[in-house]
Amino acid sequence: MEFPDHSRHLLQCLSEQRHQGFLCDCTVLVGDAQFRAHRAVLASCSMYFHLFYKDQLDKRDIVHLNSDIVTAPAFALLLEFMYEGKLQFKDLPIEDVLAAASYLHMYDIVKVCKKKLKEKATTEADSTKKEEDASSCSDKVESLSDGSSHMAGDLPSDEDEGEDEKLNILPSKRDLAAEPGNMWMRLPSDSAGIPQAGGEAEPHATAAGKTVASPCSSTESLSQRSVTSVRDSADVDCVLDLSVKSSLSGVENLNSSYFSSQDVLRSNLVQVKVEKEASCDESDVGTNDYDMEHSTVKESVSTNNRVQYEPAHLAPLREDSVLRELEREDKASDDEMMTPESERVQVEGGMESSLLPYVSNILSPAGQIFMCPLCNKVFPSPHILQIHLSTHFREQDGLRSKPAADVNVPTCSLCGKTFSCMYTLKRHERTHSGEKPYTCTQCGKSFQYSHNLSRHAVVHTREKPHACKWCERRFTQSGDLYRHIRKFHCELVNSLSVKSEALSLPAVRDWTLEDSSQELWK
């Protein structure tokens, strides 16, 4: 005959006895909190208490739990579960219950806590995703409404379409020869603010392919392009007018047109310089006007802080033009003879003084240059500078790694292995000779190294310095302790290795094995 309610009645009686303190034969201390309980119940529900009472039952009346891992409310909850068979989290954090259950080897509670944490993480992730979707939808609606209103306000009228095309696109034969397939452009907002030169407006309005012969007119058009390109560089991010799109079928985007305008500007600078030398025999008035215009163009190119960067294929063109200018100025100014070495030094010094401010403006968006402190090379970004510096450090490390020929390095005569000092060499030579200089005074056993003798001496003193932190069993050697942990506490180690990253919860503690400063029992 079976009594189904017997187990429930037994637990109820034990719970009443615990509350009354009747026949309680142990006290569990968690920090400052004390819990009276029965050893039989604790050992039946927790593998920790089972191993704790297994060896010396009579000397274990008080049990100290690590308060850094097990909190008093969490242990009270688990104690109620042991006596009543019910687990009620109430307002207690699930993480604390998980830590206490893992410490006490209550694996059923550990599974329940992990399941609840996963459900909590899933619900939080779903709610966060819904909020992000709602916010992204609202942002898209706002951006669409703003974009439609902006485009409606920027649309030009059909009557002014032809005039805008004439004002915004200024092609010439010289530009097409410098960069075929690309044309220089200007935004509609700048057409009204910059007046055209007198010698330039009429030829472009009547015939687009007509070339200008005089240096003054060419420099005027070049200066006008430089001013317009400066204003375009400040407004790179703005949208082109729709009226210009019909004439820009060969241009892919604004950046390519911006680069082509810079190419045309560089080529015009070189050609204008040649024209200046060809027309040096003309009247002084034309020469003075040209010099004034050309100095303006050079100033706008070299000291313009709005130019952000330059394509890599323009660097050789600019360097060649600067070198030609420097050579011509040197030949015109220096009448006395110079050696080849002094000529090369002067040209290199001129290049550095002229290129350094220009590179400082175009290589870095913030107007910065990154120079190597060892070789004075200039780089466009700090990342490339770090890669370059690593080559210097590798060279220095290579020089350090090669010892000098006259330095005596401790080397083993049998196997050729090198060592940092003579002490390590002598220790290594014992592996070849079999020498064992350290002898135990009690049993006469010899050892090669002193630490092996110290480990052996514990056998004679019967000292057990290695203790298990879960069941407090003590061992003479550390290897015996490791084997004991693998045999009896392997599941605990695996359960405590679960980290907060696996659960995707930043609030979950990292339950790794840590050294406890308090003893578990006295």
Curated annotation (Swiss-Prot):
<dbReference type="InterPro" id="IPR036236">
    <property type="entry name" value="Znf_C2H2_sf"/>
</dbReference>
<dbReference type="GO" id="GO:0000981">
    <property type="term" value="F:DNA-binding transcription factor activity, RNA polymerase II-specific"/>
</dbReference>
<feature type="domain" description="BTB">
    <location>
        <begin position="24"/>
        <end position="91"/>
    </location>
</feature>
<keyword id="KW-0539">Nucleus</keyword>
<dbReference type="GO" id="GO:0005634">
    <property type="term" value="C:nucleus"/>
</dbReference>
<keyword id="KW-0805">Transcription regulation</keyword>
<feature type="modified residue" description="Phosphoserine">
    <location>
        <position position="157"/>
    </location>
</feature>
<feature type="region of interest" description="Interaction with DNMT3A">
    <location>
        <begin position="310"/>
        <end position="427"/>
    </location>
</feature>
<feature type="region of interest" description="Disordered">
    <location>
        <begin position="121"/>
        <end position="165"/>
    </location>
</feature>
<feature type="modified residue" description="Phosphoserine">
    <location>
        <position position="517"/>
    </location>
</feature>
<keyword id="KW-0832">Ubl conjugation</keyword>
<keyword id="KW-0217">Developmental protein</keyword>
<dbReference type="Pfam" id="PF00096">
    <property type="entry name" value="zf-C2H2"/>
</dbReference>
<dbReference type="GO" id="GO:0000122">
    <property type="term" value="P:negative regulation of transcription by RNA polymerase II"/>
</dbReference>
<dbReference type="InterPro" id="IPR000210">
    <property type="entry name" value="BTB/POZ_dom"/>
</dbReference>
<comment type="function">
    <text>Transcriptional repressor that plays a role in various developmental processes such as myogenesis and brain development. Specifically binds the consensus DNA sequence 5'-[AC]ACATCTG[GT][AC]-3' which contains the E box core, and acts by recruiting chromatin remodeling multiprotein complexes. Plays a key role in myogenesis by directly repressing the expression of ID2 and ID3, 2 inhibitors of skeletal myogenesis. Also involved in controlling cell division of progenitor cells and regulating the survival of postmitotic cortical neurons.</text>
</comment>
<feature type="zinc finger region" description="C2H2-type 4">
    <location>
        <begin position="466"/>
        <end position="489"/>
    </location>
</feature>
<keyword id="KW-0238">DNA-binding</keyword>
<feature type="zinc finger region" description="C2H2-type 1">
    <location>
        <begin position="370"/>
        <end position="392"/>
    </location>
</feature>
<comment type="subunit">
    <text>Interacts with DNMT3A.</text>
</comment>
<keyword id="KW-0863">Zinc-finger</keyword>
<keyword id="KW-0479">Metal-binding</keyword>
<keyword id="KW-0678">Repressor</keyword>
<feature type="cross-link" description="Glycyl lysine isopeptide (Lys-Gly) (interchain with G-Cter in SUMO2)">
    <location>
        <position position="273"/>
    </location>
</feature>
<keyword id="KW-1017">Isopeptide bond</keyword>
<keyword id="KW-0677">Repeat</keyword>
<keyword id="KW-0804">Transcription</keyword>
<dbReference type="GO" id="GO:0045892">
    <property type="term" value="P:negative regulation of DNA-templated transcription"/>
</dbReference>
<keyword id="KW-0862">Zinc</keyword>
<feature type="zinc finger region" description="C2H2-type 2">
    <location>
        <begin position="410"/>
        <end position="432"/>
    </location>
</feature>
<dbReference type="GO" id="GO:0043565">
    <property type="term" value="F:sequence-specific DNA binding"/>
</dbReference>
<protein>
    <recommendedName>
        <fullName>Zinc finger and BTB domain-containing protein 18</fullName>
    </recommendedName>
</protein>
<feature type="compositionally biased region" description="Basic and acidic residues">
    <location>
        <begin position="121"/>
        <end position="143"/>
    </location>
</feature>
<dbReference type="InterPro" id="IPR011333">
    <property type="entry name" value="SKP1/BTB/POZ_sf"/>
</dbReference>
<dbReference type="Pfam" id="PF13894">
    <property type="entry name" value="zf-C2H2_4"/>
</dbReference>
<feature type="modified residue" description="Phosphoserine">
    <location>
        <position position="516"/>
    </location>
</feature>
<dbReference type="Pfam" id="PF00651">
    <property type="entry name" value="BTB"/>
</dbReference>
<dbReference type="GO" id="GO:0006357">
    <property type="term" value="P:regulation of transcription by RNA polymerase II"/>
</dbReference>
<feature type="zinc finger region" description="C2H2-type 3">
    <location>
        <begin position="438"/>
        <end position="460"/>
    </location>
</feature>
<dbReference type="GO" id="GO:0007519">
    <property type="term" value="P:skeletal muscle tissue development"/>
</dbReference>
<dbReference type="InterPro" id="IPR013087">
    <property type="entry name" value="Znf_C2H2_type"/>
</dbReference>
<comment type="similarity">
    <text>Belongs to the krueppel C2H2-type zinc-finger protein family. ZBTB18 subfamily.</text>
</comment>
